Regions:
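Membrane-interface extramembranous regions
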Residues: 1-145
Length: 145
């Protein structure tokens, strides 16, 4: 198999896996929210709704990035750049949520398995996107020669 295709297939797989991880996180937040409501705790409703929305949206974005990459036949730079920007933005948001806090949610103290898994997957997305961009640049140079 061509190394270029191996990189993009791996990237698509990681993008889809990251999307699935975010759906699991959203489901976990939803079950936590339902549990709080069952105990009569309504103070965290807005926080949970924002978190669930963020995680579902993030999962959908990762699925969309994988489809965009496939649709452009892996030769456009923009999906790779978008994947890096989205992943980096979510990593920065995560770090901020654990240190200085983010609006509505505040400072989160819990670091779960899915948190770590999603950050590892996002780091791999960034690395594979860089590799994909490098391969595109090499292909362009080869065509010019």
């Amino acid at each position: 198999m061509n190394k270029n295709l191996l990189i993009v297939y791996a990237l698509c797989g990681i993008l889809i896996s990251t999307g699935i991880a975010y759906f699991f996180v959203a489901y976990g937040e939803y079950t936590d929210w339902m549990e709080l409501l069952n105990f009569g705790i309504h103070d965290e409703t807005t926080e949970k709704q924002v978190e669930i929305t963020l995680f579902v949206t993030s999962g959908l974005i990762y699925f969309g990035l994988a489809l965009w990459l496939i649709k452009t036949r892996f030769m456009k730079k923009s999906p790779y750049i978008a994947a890096m920007i989205v992943s980096l933005a979510l990593i920065i948001t995560y770090i901020a949520s654990r240190t200085v806090g983010v609006p509505i949610v505040g400072v989160e103290l819990y670091v779960g398995k899915l948190d770590v898994i999603s950050k590892i997957l996002q780091s791999v997305v960034i690395a594979l996107s860089f590799a994909g961009l490098y391969k595109i640049q090499q292909s362009v140079r080869a065509l010019r020669v």
